[in-house]
């Protein structure tokens, strides 16, 4: 027992150093490892979390070890000038010469998970503000949900149930609609999810009432909230189901892994789906044709349903996530996260016209 407590304390110290790289805005909601009560909670874990190095990766978009590159390092001037880029045509996906347009900006880690609502507006998870806001097609922002316990990524299933990862102390996957309730917050041994180490990064909700989520590894919380881990040698970040829900995609550093989804939601046949041309994969989305879109560095990589890399859509800055929205769901939105010289995060939402249509069978 004493050895486990010592290991837990060493983990807390290492994790605190990673989180100290980013300054919280005044009044911001802390993520679990930043909370003063985190050390005591971790010391009670039956199975202590592994050290950050064992989970792989640097700070991800959730600000947690184990993700992709995440927010860029503080530049000498802020914001840094945008990179020059030229969009070349990808047949059926995007026309040549299209440009990204900045449509909204805010301070803090306040534009993390994004997805479309039924009217084509963009729902945005605000991690530091513990809120969800709606960005309409006229550029106006209004609150939708408050007090989301440092809520991050969002996912809506085909039946309209909206789920969110909540990253405050005692992390959980929460259903926001139609009924607001905690969906999953414990592992099979009774430990809180915090005992996995770091914070929950992303999620994808299925039509069975279950939710796949990433937290260093890959997990599935079934309709009753029972959590099972899947996959081997994974350094996860983004996760999403194919339109037919027969395949689950999850980023794994410079590659994307795929799994066959079984009738009960369990996963089999882990395999490498595609190797990315640059950067570590972060956010994922799909279109109506079943193509997969992966944000990695200053680009969105487009992958056919058979794993063939079709091309890349360059961007002026590194993107942490992307989603289709708009009235016809033919606009792609991407989120940029930058850190200023005071170590404060800033979030920017960009949009670009697409030839491809986002999948309309669910929000993302």
Indicate residue ranges for each PLM-predicted region:
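Short amphipathic alpha-helical "recognition" segments used for binding
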Residues: 6-7, 130
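Bacterial N-terminal signal peptides
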Residues: 7-18
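Positively charged n-region of N-terminal signal peptides that target proteins for export
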Residues: 1-4, 322
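Sequence-structural signature of mature extracellular/luminal beta-sheet repeat domains
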Residues: 21-364
């Amino acid at each position: 027992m004493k050895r486990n407590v010592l290991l837990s304390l060493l983990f807390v110290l290492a994790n605190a150093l990673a989180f100290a790289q980013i300054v919280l805005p005044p009044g911001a909601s802390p993520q679990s490892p930043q909370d003063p009560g985190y050390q005591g909670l971790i010391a009670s874990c039956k199975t202590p979390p592994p050290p950050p190095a064992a989970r792989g990766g640097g700070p991800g978009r959730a600000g947690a070890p184990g993700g992709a590159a995440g927010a860029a390092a503080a530049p000498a001037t802020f914001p840094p000038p945008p990179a020059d880029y030229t969009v070349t045509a990808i047949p059926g996906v995007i026309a040549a010469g299209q440009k990204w347009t900045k449509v909204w900006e805010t301070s803090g880690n306040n534009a993390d998970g994004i997805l479309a609502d039924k009217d084509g507006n963009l729902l945005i998870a605000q991690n530091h503000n513990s809120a969800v806001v709606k960005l309409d097609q006229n550029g106006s922002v209004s609150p939708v949900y408050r007090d989301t316990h440092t809520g991050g990524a969002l996912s809506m299933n085909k039946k309209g149930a909206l789920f969110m990862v909540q990253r405050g102390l005692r992390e959980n996957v929460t259903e926001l609609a139609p009924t607001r309730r905690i969906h999953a917050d414990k592992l099979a041994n009774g430990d809180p999810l915090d005992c996995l180490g770091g914070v929950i990064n992303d999620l994808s909700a299925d039509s069975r009432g279950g939710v796949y989520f990433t937290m260093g590894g890959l997990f599935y919380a079934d309709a009753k909230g029972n959590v099972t881990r899947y996959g081997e040698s994974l350094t996860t970040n983004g996760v999403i189901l194919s339109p037919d829900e027969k395949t689950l995609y999850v980023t794994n550093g410079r590659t994307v892994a795929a799994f066959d989804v079984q009738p009960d939601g369990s996963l089999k046949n882990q395999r490498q789906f595609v190797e990315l041309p640059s950067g570590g994969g972060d956010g994922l989305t799909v279109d109506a044709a079943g193509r997969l879109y992966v944000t990695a560095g200053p680009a969105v990589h487009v992958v056919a349903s058979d794993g063939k890399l079709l091309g890349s859509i360059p961007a002026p800055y590194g993107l942490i996530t992307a989603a289709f929205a708009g009235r016809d769901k033919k606009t792609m939105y991407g989120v940029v996260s930058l850190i200023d010289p005071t170590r404060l995060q800033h979030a920017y939402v960009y949009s670009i016209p697409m030839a491809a249509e986002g999948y309309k069978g669910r929000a993302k």
